[in-house]
Curated annotation (Swiss-Prot):
Cited function: NDH-1 shuttles electrons from NADH, via FMN and iron-sulfur (Fe-S) centers, to quinones in the respiratory chain. The immediate electron acceptor for the enzyme in this species is believed to be ubiquinone. Couples the redox reaction to proton translocation (for every two electrons transferred, four hydrogen ions are translocated across the cytoplasmic membrane), and thus conserves the redox energy in a proton gradient.
Predominant subcellular localization, coarse grouping: membrane
Cofactor field: [4Fe-4S] cluster
Highest taxon of the lineage: Bacteria
Species per Swiss-Prot/TrEMBL record: Polaromonas naphthalenivorans (strain CJ2)
The name this protein goes by in its record: NADH-quinone oxidoreductase subunit I
Membrane topology: Peripheral membrane protein
Gene: nuoI
Reaction catalysis annotation: a quinone + NADH + 5 H(+)(in) = a quinol + NAD(+) + 4 H(+)(out)
Length: 165
């Protein structure tokens, strides 16, 4: 390092130029419009592709959509989905057990993409919690209840996203 460079470094550090540059940047944004959102009171709009709490859907006649193909179970990278199926008298398969462990789930959306009948979907519900570990273990009945309750919202989001699928 030359003497001139070391003198420049000394003067720069002595005059606190980095500190002044930082203060100038802070001053520049101090009086601009605030963009912080106070979350529980204010909510931002969510994309139709947002991946939140899972739900199982039914057909309009009330029959559950899941045909127990187990594609979602096979494609799940976190191994969060467990499915058991039974064969009906007419030869069709339906699930007898469909469980999702949300403590394992990484919300990748592969289950939703792989489903051939749009049975498993991820809703816009992002405010859920559990007081115990078992509270985040969703059974088939719980997932169907979520799907029944939010079917109109799910259908609207699927329709808004249909041209991109």
């Amino acid at each position: 390092m030359s003497a001139v460079a070391s003198v420049k470094d000394f003067v720069s550090s002595f005059m606190l130029t980095e500190l002044l540059k930082g203060m100038a940047l802070t001053g520049k944004y101090m009086f601009s419009r605030k963009i912080t959102i106070q979350f529980p009171e204010e909510k931002t709009p969510l994309s139709p592709r947002f991946r939140g709490l899972h739900a199982l859907r039914r057909y309009e006649n009330g029959e559950e959509r899941c045909i127990a193909c187990k594609l979602c179970e096979a494609v799940c990278p976190a191994l969060a989905i467990t499915i058991e199926s039974d064969v009906r008298e007419d030869g069709s398969r339906r699930t007898s057990r469909y469980d999702i462990d949300l403590t394992k789930c990484i919300f990748c959306g592969f289950c939703e993409e792989s489903c051939p009948v749009d049975s498993i979907v991820e809703t816009h519900i992002l405010e859920y919690h559990g007081e115990k570990r078992g509270d985040l273990y969703f059974t088939k009945e719980m997932l169907l209840a979520v799907g029944d309750r939010y079917e109109n919202e799910i259908a609207a989001n699927r329709a808004a996203d249909a041209k991109y699928r």
